[in-house]
């Protein structure tokens, strides 16, 4: 009887751990590392803007897998168009030039079950330190 109780408790702990992990990684987490005052922020990144972003990408264990900072060349892309992982499209939205954010991106908003080559394993949560370098728009901006 004692073995059955131990097995039931162990099974319940396992199930609780699985649900806690899934819940923890379900949403994009955005941390502000450097905030820009409203007086200095004359423009926020919006869907359709072409943005330039410096970043350092890490796995949860701290392994750096990519860094535009090390290359000295920010990445440039149209925001909200799916040209980057969904966690980036969501996490850069609303940033001001000069603002820095820490984006903790769960697998389903990153590279998911397939990962990315030999660099990013399947089901990886990614951590990016980002800085918005510039915003370029042609006067034709979509609403948030």
Swiss-Prot record:
UniProt GO BP: chaperone-mediated protein folding
A GO CC annotation given for this chain: endoplasmic reticulum
A UniProt-annotated Pfam family: FKBP_C
Ranges in a coiled coil: none
Superkingdom, natural source: Eukaryota
Prevents secretion from ER, short sequence motif: residues: 141-144
Start and end residues of each PPIase FKBP-type domain: 48-136
InterPro entries hit by this protein: FKBP2/11, PPIase_dom_sf, PPIase_FKBP_dom
Activity regulation (record text): Inhibited by both FK506 and rapamycin.
Enzyme class: isomerase
Catalytic activity: [protein]-peptidylproline (omega=180) = [protein]-peptidylproline (omega=0)
GO molecular function: peptidyl-prolyl cis-trans isomerase activity
Keywords: Endoplasmic reticulum, Isomerase, Rotamase, Signal
Signal peptide feature range: 1-20
SUPFAM superfamilies: FKBP-like
Protein purpose: PPIases accelerate the folding of proteins. It catalyzes the cis-trans isomerization of proline imidic peptide bonds in oligopeptides.
Stated name of the protein: FK506-binding protein 2
Species of origin: Yarrowia lipolytica (strain CLIB 122 / E 150)
Lineage: Eukaryota, Fungi, Dikarya, Ascomycota, Saccharomycotina
């Amino acid at each position: 009887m004692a073995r059955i109780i131990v097995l039931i408790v162990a099974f319940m702990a396992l199930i609780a751990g699985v649900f806690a992990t899934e819940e923890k990684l379900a949403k994009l987490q955005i941390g502000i590392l450097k905030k820009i005052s409203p007086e200095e922020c004359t423009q926020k990144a919006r869907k359709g803007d072409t943005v330039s972003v410096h970043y350092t990408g890490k796995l949860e264990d701290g392994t750096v897998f990519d860094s535009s900072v090390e290359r000295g060349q920010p990445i440039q892309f149209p925001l909200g168009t799916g040209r980057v992982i969904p966690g980036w499209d969501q996490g850069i939205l609303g940033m001001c030039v000069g603002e820095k954010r820490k984006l903790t991106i769960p697998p389903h908003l990153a590279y998911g079950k397939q990962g990315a080559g030999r660099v990013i394993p399947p089901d990886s949560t990614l951590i990016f330190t980002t800085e918005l370098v510039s915003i370029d728009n042609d006067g034709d901006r979509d609403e948030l």
